């Protein structure tokens, strides 16, 4: 059997695989904020990015390695393809971290070998020991992944894994790259790897999966029963296509059903020892932070962290819950850090009190960002009687986005009504400090604002998503707007909140435009792109 650390190790890849969600690009400050919250959450490994992809990715991984973790904190990991330039860049980026890991991979399925890598099985068998050994020359902790393992020939897969371990890999990751496998098949795959790889006892078995068939979490739990001891997952399940296995669902499944899973770890069913090191009370905070910074709204019926996860509409259910919550709830909302507490901050609250509460919520702002957030807080306190944690999260999330914005919104005015043509007047400050104003008509106030902004910024794009939701209850609630725009096939998100949803929409659109401008001309490599093609292009 594979190495058993006595519990499940949580490998968070929100900042790498999660960021590959269309429109979920994050800047350095946002990545650092998420990494710091992941450390508070208690994950074992943070995959901070793919350093070779671009200078921006390298800088973000390096910044996280310098500022997050420590001897008692998480391992900081970087991803690299099985090539020396990739591995060297990864090693340099993670070098400042006290605990570091290189995660290198190569495809093992015939379809990937033939159509993507254009390599034979023999060539892969030659590459694996060379590249794992090269990674091992930089760090003691090396993880190796067999990309598309779920569709690979088993005998070839066993041979590759054995070679990787004998070359120094400490962790072997088995990815279901396209979300194809079913739970029983995945369990059998992990079991057969344990049975057929002679040196598997020298490495921890890990799993990575996508949710294309909605089976990622179920697959992982079956893998755990058969010896997998590291789970690669993301906050809110974000990721390419249908997303990755959701961290919060895995953690709470292992928490709530501990008595069921304990025997698979050689424990008595009643053992109270947690199966992971995650602090469950940080789950809701982590979910909201990732949602706010990526602009990816969590669906209301999402397990564990959705707005309706602990809501009861049925009268029968409500009656039962009032009498005893266990009648219809298997999780106490407080276990995941969800509470209805309102913070007692108001017009007379000082900067220190606001800063302390923001730190509790996972935001560690620099002096300039704190001043901006405090100004917005005071403005909101003049318009809203009660300030909740959700309000604070909404108003501060923009402060870590686009600190060097090219466009700044100065003024928005609209006139509209039953017998009026919607008209917007917008003033924007450019990078040179010059103010420009435009007036536009539209089918509605938001359309008019967007048209005015487009005429001022002259950044061609396609608006593909506009959504607005109430942050809290009440007529004075903040309206939270998320906007996605597209150019050249790339998606960019903008997010903002205000008691005036038209103002929020204008700021969200500006934020999306600033992301677009920041990314314009910046080359970035996807880790699953054909290495040979990339090298020919000289990237």
Curated annotation (Swiss-Prot):
Disulfide bonds: none annotated. It is an enzyme of class 2 (transferase). Residues 8-269 form the Pyruvate carboxyltransferase domain. SUPFAM superfamilies: 2-isopropylmalate synthase LeuA, allosteric (dimerisation) domain, Aldolase. Residues 408-539 are annotated as: Regulatory domain. Keywords: Amino-acid biosynthesis, Branched-chain amino acid biosynthesis, Cytoplasm, Leucine biosynthesis, Manganese, Metal-binding, Transferase. Pathway: Amino-acid biosynthesis; L-leucine biosynthesis; L-leucine from 3-methyl-2-oxobutanoate: step 1/4. It holds the Pfam family HMGL-like. Homodimer. Belongs to the alpha-IPM synthase/homocitrate synthase family. LeuA type 1 subfamily. Catalyzes the condensation of the acetyl group of acetyl-CoA with 3-methyl-2-oxobutanoate (2-ketoisovalerate) to form 3-carboxy-3-hydroxy-4-methylpentanoate (2-isopropylmalate). This is 2-isopropylmalate synthase. It comes from Prochlorococcus marinus (strain NATL2A).
């Amino acid at each position: 059997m594979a190495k058993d650390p006595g519990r499940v190790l949580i490998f968070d890849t929100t900042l790498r695989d999660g960021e590959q969600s269309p429109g979920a690009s994050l800047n350095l400050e946002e990545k650092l904020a998420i990494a710091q919250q992941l450390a508070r959450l208690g994950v074992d490994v943070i995959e901070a990015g793919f350093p070779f992809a671009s200078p921006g990715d390298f800088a973000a991984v390096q910044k996280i390695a310098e500022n997050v973790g420590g001897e008692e904190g998480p391992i900081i990991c970087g991803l690299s393809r099985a090539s020396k330039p990739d591995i060297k860049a990864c090693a340099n980026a993670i070098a400042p971290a006290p605990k570091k890991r290189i995660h290198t991979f190569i495809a093992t399925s015939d379809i990937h070998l033939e159509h993507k890598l254009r390599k034979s099985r023999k060539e892969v068998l030659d590459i694996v020991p060379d590249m794992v050994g090269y990674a091992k020359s930089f760090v003691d902790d090396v993880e190796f992944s067999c990309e598309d393992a779920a569709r690979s020939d088993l005998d070839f897969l066993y041979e590759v894994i054995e070679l990787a371990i004998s070359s120094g890999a400490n962790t072997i990751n088995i990815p279901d790259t396209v979300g194809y496998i079913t739970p029983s098949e995945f369990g059998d795959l992990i079991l057969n790897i344990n049975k057929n790889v002679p040196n598997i006892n020298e490495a921890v078995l890990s799993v990575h999966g996508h949710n294309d068939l909605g089976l990622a979490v179920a697959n992982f739990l079956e893998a755990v029963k058969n010896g997998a001891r590291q789970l690669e997952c993301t906050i809110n399940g974000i990721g390419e296509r249908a997303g990755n296995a959701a961290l919060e669902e895995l953690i709470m499944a292992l928490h709530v059903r501990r008595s069921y899973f304990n025997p698979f770890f050689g424990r008595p069913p009643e053992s109270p020892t947690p199966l992971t090191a995650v602090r469950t009370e940080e789950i809701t905070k982590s979910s909201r932070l990732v949602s706010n910074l990526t602009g990816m709204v969590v669906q209301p019926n999402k397990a564990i962290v959705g707005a309706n996860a602990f809501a009861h509409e049925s009268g029968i259910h409500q009656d039962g819950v009032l009498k005893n919550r266990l009648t219809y709830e298997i999780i106490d909302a407080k276990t995941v850090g969800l509470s209805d507490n309102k913070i007692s901050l108001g017009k007379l609250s000082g900067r220190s009190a606001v800063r302390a509460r923001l730190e509790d919520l996972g935001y560690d702002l620099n002096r300039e960002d704190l001043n901006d957030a405090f100004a917005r807080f005071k403005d909101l306190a003049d318009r809203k009687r009660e300030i909740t944690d959700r309000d604070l999260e909404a108003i501060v999330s923009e402060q870590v986005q686009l600190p060097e914005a090219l466009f700044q919104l100065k003024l928005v005015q609209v006139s509209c009504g039953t017998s009026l043509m919607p008209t917007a007047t917008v003033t924007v400050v450019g990078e040179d400090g010059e103010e420009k104003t435009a007036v536009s008509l539209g089918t509605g106030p938001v359309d008019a604002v967007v048209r005015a902004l487009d005429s001022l910024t002259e950044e061609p794009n396609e608006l593909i998503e506009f959504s607005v939701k109430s942050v809290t209850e009440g007529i004075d609630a903040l309206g939270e707007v998320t906007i996605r725009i597209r150019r050249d096939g790339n998606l960019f998100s903008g997010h903002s909140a205000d008691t005036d949803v038209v103002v929020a929409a204008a700021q969200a659109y500006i934020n999306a435009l600033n992301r677009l401008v920041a990314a314009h001309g910046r080359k970035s490599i996807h880790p699953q792109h054909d290495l040979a093609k990339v090298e020919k292009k000289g990237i």
